[in-house]
């Protein structure tokens, strides 16, 4: 019987339970951060339990850490007392339970879903969990990864296992060559715009097809990261030679790397017949996507007009966003820019944004923050001069962290601002109370910052702008 990539990794990790019932899974890697770990650690203390496998647990500080003024080197840089408490609590918990921590200022510190692949902790065939909804990111390297809740975190702490009901298989077959200026972000935004925010509920989603085969690894992780906004719990891509080349030489990969590669090669879907549902997506004529409303499904391709009001949700979104029905995308004003996050905070993302901004300057009245996804990304970007391109354009170059993706740290976008953002969520108040978020690719966001409104970035890549 044909199996999917997801089936194969899942089956390798089943300890107990029948098909169709909850099954007990072994967890290879548990990633934790300061926001969702305090209560589970307290639960261990109250029960008098030890952490089952500290060697399979890795912690970082990302959600609450400030990213300016640089350098942010210690918890003393944190002014918000609630944020400081969460950070110092994680530091103490890691000391008490023997967990490795990428602390503030450490060379490995950064967003949890950026540093996992960067360090080589993320590997094909692994089962990875984290108390964060965008844990599916790691599926871009062929791992089975998903977000878990507080009680589940404590269960993994105590047993290194987790009870789960196996979801069905959804294949997204992507064909067509991406035009210059079109990126993975546009693909996933187009999917969610067409099918909605819950179409993949109850499914493990796998992207496949010639477009995916051509795609660089960091772009693949954008796909697996953001499809959570379409309802999927798990998103995966078959590991291939690009995956193995990406991982080779990274700090935490197996010592006998070639032997590991031979093991990883088994993790691939046998046949599309193994999927329960297949979506076909031809991206040959895909345009850059921009979100206009307050859910990721409220997005349109460049060149389209915003939709007419057809229900109260759309009416409320227009009221919050201070936009007019059927206005052109290019008429959306932009006065703030954020480049970063676990969706688009990697080196390749910063390169594309810098490519657009090089030799130009932000439009009058526009403020921009560029926040690398990790200390490693920051150093690599500075080594090739990306920081100077951004600062010459008028942007602030900051230290790594989740930053303005979410209003949980000092990096809040002011109320009323229209922010072009490379993030994955555009809910009301997501980037700060009253903030209006417009998601797009790093290239589109950079171009919007230069022009003060959205433009067709494809023209830049065609040498016309």
From Swiss-Prot:
EC number(s) recorded for this UniProt protein: 4.2.1.33
Name under which the protein is recorded: 3-isopropylmalate dehydratase large subunit
Pfam name, any one: Aconitase
Protein's GO biological process: L-leucine biosynthetic process
Annotated GO MF terms: 3-isopropylmalate dehydratase activity; 4 iron, 4 sulfur cluster binding; metal ion binding
Family according to the record: Belongs to the aconitase/IPM isomerase family. LeuC type 1 subfamily.
Function: Catalyzes the isomerization between 2-isopropylmalate and 3-isopropylmalate, via the formation of 2-isopropylmaleate.
Pathway(s) served: Amino-acid biosynthesis; L-leucine biosynthesis; L-leucine from 3-methyl-2-oxobutanoate: step 2/4
Subunit structure: Heterodimer of LeuC and LeuD.
